[in-house]
A protein has these predicted regions:
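Solvent-exposed loop/turn segments at secondary-structure junctions
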Residues: 115, 256-258, 292-295, 349-352
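Carboxylate/His-rich catalytic cores and anion/metal-binding grooves
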Residues: 257-276, 280, 325, 329-332, ...
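Catalytic cores of large soluble enzymes that bind and process phosphate-bearing ligands
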Residues: 80, 103, 242, 279, ...
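Short coil/turn connectors at secondary-structure junctions
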Residues: 246-247, 282-284
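N-terminal accessory beta-strand-rich subdomains and adjacent acidic, glycine-rich linkers
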Residues: 4-276
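Tryptophan-centered motif/residue detector
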Residues: 144, 202, 288-290, 300
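Substrate-binding cleft of carbohydrate-active enzyme catalytic domains
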Residues: 286-288, 296-384
Length: 384
């Protein structure tokens, strides 16, 4: 079974296919040229058998949208949201006959797809151990990438061919304290340029109540596969009650690099503003109790052990807690005298003593309990 959907200008087409063994796949064409080769889709679960095949199509729907909405905050006031959509309804041929819907949207500046698990008998919660979304490339493209670090987005970008990507070489960075790169994967967005000059960017949108996505690099098969950021403490990636939808998996497509920046694909796929009136949002400068920890003047923790020298050897520990009530007031005075509207404070809450250099640091912060030398209410009162 096959089905297709094209963008409004018909320059981009998504083709859906169900292989003989019931594996859902998709491919993408731009101006009649392949951009994404047939790529499979599916899931692995902790509380259910994997859902990667044995499916049949029970129906399809098509939709179109052409609207203009006002961006509450950003670089462009009015944004056009124009796409064609294909919804494929799937169900297992055999028990437990689980149902899965896949939504495909074709825009003039790219494509997106997401999964939807409808309400169904016998399943109220799904515990996802991994998502098996593949992106099969058409060549050894030039790539701009960051390693798939589960903790941070603080690495520099690298430029290489796709087959030249090796994120594991970025492990144990001497200047990054909380870094975890479990395999050869990249954080999104990863941006590519094909031999013909076509520019691609792979990312996600509407990331709500779901694990973030990295992309495993498979140079032998010229393919990427989604790897959800996990938790050793929990032992799974996502736990959701039905019905629910995954984030959108996005591919922005442009003839040149500026077109990727001009693309509004991501914001069109994100949820509309839920806050209502945001006219009170105003830009501001702020100062922070933060950089002094990097300079070794003070520490994040009250115990006096956690500053930049905790994982570098060319500095002397400050051993003096930075986020104290007294220091915060000093920063507030400086900000007020210089017309600076905000103050950022790091290290005010308990848990920092078990952060840098600890493999079991997950969950050490409750983001509620202050250290005894930081009076949160007094700092707020003084700032007002």
């Amino acid at each position: 079974m096959t089905a297709s959907v094209s963008s409004p200008s018909e320059n981009i087409t998504i083709d859906f296919s169900l292989e003989k063994n019931g594996i859902p796949t998709y491919s993408v064409m731009q101006q009649g040229t392949a951009v994404i080769q047939p790529s499979s889709l599916g899931f692995e679960f902790q509380n259910q058998p994997e859902l990667t095949g044995g499916l049949e199509v029970t129906g399809t729907d098509t939709n179109s949208e052409n609207e203009t909405w006002e961006m509450p905050w950003g670089e462009q006031r009015n944004v056009r949201n124009r796409y064609n959509e294909l919804v494929v309804h799937l169900q297992e041929k055999e028990a437990p006959n689980r149902m899965l819907d896949i939504y495909f949207r074709a825009y003039d500046d790219g494509v997106a797809f997401r999964y939807h698990f409808p309400e169904q008998e016998g399943i109220d919660t799904l515990i996802i151990t991994d998502e098996k979304s593949q992106f099969s490339l058409t060549g050894d493209h030039t790539c701009w990438w960051q390693p798939g670090d589960w903790d941070i987005y603080e690495h520099l970008y690298n430029t290489s061919s796709f087959t030249g990507i090796d994120a594991t070489t970025k492990r144990d960075h001497p200047d990054l304290n909380s870094s975890y790169i479990p395999e050869n994967a990249v954080n999104t967005p990863i941006t590519m340029r094909t031999a013909d000059g076509l520019h691609l960017s792979f990312h996600e949108a509407a990331l709500i109540d779901y694990a973030g996505m990295t992309l495993r690099i498979d140079p032998e098969n010229m393919r990427m596969e989604s790897v959800l950021v996990g938790s050793d403490r929990l032992g799974y990636k996502v736990k959701r009650g039905l019905p629910f939808s995954s984030p959108w998996r996005t591919i922005q497509i442009s003839e040149d690099a500026p077109g990727l920046i001009e693309s509004k694909l991501i914001v069109n796929l994100n949820e509309p503003n839920r806050l209502g009136d945001i006219s009170w949002f105003t830009p501001m400068k702020y100062v922070g109790i933060w950089w002094e920890m990097h300079l070794g003047i003070s520490t994040w923790d009250m115990e006096g052990t956690q500053d930049m020298s905790t994982f570098t050897t060319d500095q002397v520990t400050g051993s003096k807690h930075g986020a104290t009530t007294e220091n915060a007031k000093r920063y507030i005075d400086f900000a007020a005298e210089n017309g600076i509207k905000g103050l950022l404070v790091e290290g005010w809450n308990t848990g920092w003593d078990h952060w840098i250099g600890f493999e079991d640091r997950e969950g050490v912060f409750d983001f509620i309990t202050p250290y005894s030398d930081y009076d949160l209410e007094e700092v707020v009162r003084y700032g007002r």
